[in-house]
């Protein structure tokens, strides 16, 4: 779909957003698609960390992926962090400090990796917010994201 959009409207900017568990899918997807930026919002960046921190999701992960020790290859295929490289688009990490669904250490882990490989990134850590920001914080988040995407577009012109 992104390729079709880019073919029909080559000058259009495409910004991809991955929220929560969609964060890891987005990290895996944008490597193959011509996107101008990626926003990971309250997102999982490492499936191993998700397995460790979310005891309530272990059953689902074992059914869908397998056990991390017995099915290492299946987990490695879903390791989005390893797919990141210097050609990755700019990434904005948005995460709440009180997020109980996806711990903020997922964001810190991703930030460390992006810094290590030299990918352009920015962070918006809202230390008093949970998985979904409260209305006033949500409004500020959306303003920040809009400003960030606009800056990405200006820099690409």
Residue locations for each model-derived region?
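Primarily recognizes the serine-hydrolase "nucleophile elbow" in alpha/beta-hydrolase
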Residues: 3-53
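Short beta-strand/loop motif that positions the catalytic acidic residue
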Residues: 87, 93-95, 99
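Hydrophobic anchor at the start of a short beta-strand
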Residues: 14, 91, 121-122
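Residue-level signal for short, function-critical loop segments
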Residues: 20, 97, 127
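Conserved alpha/beta-hydrolase "acid-adjacent" motif
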Residues: 100-106
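C-terminal catalytic histidine-bearing segment of alpha/beta-hydrolase fold enzymes
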Residues: 108-157
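Mobile cap/lid helix-loop segments that gate and shape the active-site cleft of serine hydrolases
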Residues: 48-83
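Hydrophobic/aromatic beta-strand patches that form the interior of the parallel beta-sheet core
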Residues: 37-39, 92-94, 124
């Amino acid at each position: 779909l992104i390729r079709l959009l880019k073919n029909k409207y080559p000058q259009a900017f495409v910004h991809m957003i991955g929220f929560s568990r969609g964060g890891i899918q987005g990290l895996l997807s944008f490597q193959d698609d011509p996107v101008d930026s990626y926003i990971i919002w309250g997102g999982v960046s490492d499936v191993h960390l998700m397995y460790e921190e979310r005891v309530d999701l272990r059953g689902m992960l074992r059914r869908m992926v397998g056990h991390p020790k017995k099915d290492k290859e299946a987990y490695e295929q879903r390791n989005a962090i390893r797919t990141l490289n210097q050609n990755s688009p700019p990434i904005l990490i948005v995460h709440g400090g009180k997020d109980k669904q996806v711990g903020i250490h997922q964001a810190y882990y991703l930030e460390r990796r992006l810094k290590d490989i030299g990918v352009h990134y920015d962070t918006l850590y809202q230390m008093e917010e949970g998985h979904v920001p409260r209305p006033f914080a949500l409004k500020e988040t959306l303003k920040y994201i809009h400003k960030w995407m606009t800056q990405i577009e200006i820099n690409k012109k």
